[in-house]
């Protein structure tokens, strides 16, 4: 087999607010139509759709030149909010649309590919250092919002883990 010589990488930081899990946990929003609107108002859904539009030619050629998208999505993965994990997410099983956009075009969530069970291995990246949300004095929603997706032949995902620090950086 030929070694991979080139890859294409996009690093992203999608709009942070309004943050959907806050709307669910602190404002009691449960309507999926309203949650889609929140993702649109934050800019996340338009931003990921714009990225996918930019990526179109590269997606078609990903088997020759693999593509990666990674960064701070500021939204949970649709693969993490399941019936089995609802109690960890304020009762929600909402299917977050931003990550769904990437899997719909054949991209693979690198973490969830290795760690299949979101209940056993949530991979939370927001926010393991904050237990209480200071604005609401309620438990901080714990979610995996920093993600890596990839697409291409001859890519073998050997491991993908979360590393967290011991507190705030000054």
What residue spans do the PLM features occupy?
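A long, amphipathic alpha-helix that forms part
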Residues: 35-63
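A solvent-exposed, charged loop/short amphipathic helix patch at secondary-structure junctions
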Residues: 20-42, 84
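Active-site metal-binding loops of divalent metal-dependent hydrolases
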Residues: 14, 72-73
């Amino acid at each position: 087999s030929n070694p991979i010589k080139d890859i294409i990488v996009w690093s992203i930081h999608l709009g942070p607010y309004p943050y959907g899990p806050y709307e669910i946990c602190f404002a009691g929003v449960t309507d999926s139509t309203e949650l889609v609107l929140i993702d649109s108002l934050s800019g996340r859904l338009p931003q990921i759709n714009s990225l996918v539009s930019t990526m179109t030619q590269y997606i078609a050629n990903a088997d020759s030149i693999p593509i990666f998208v990674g960064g701070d999505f500021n939204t949970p993965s649709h693969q993490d909010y399941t019936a089995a994990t609802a109690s960890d997410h304020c009762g929600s099983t909402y299917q977050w649309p931003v990550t769904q956009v990437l899997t719909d075009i054949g991209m693979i969530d690198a973490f969830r590919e290795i760690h299949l069970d979101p209940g056993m291995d949530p991979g939370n990246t927001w926010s393991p250092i904050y237990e209480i949300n200071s604005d609401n004095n309620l438990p901080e929603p714990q979610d995996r919002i920093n993600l890596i997706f990839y697409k291409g032949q001859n890519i073998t995902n050997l491991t993908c883990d979360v590393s967290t620090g011991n507190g705030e950086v000054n």
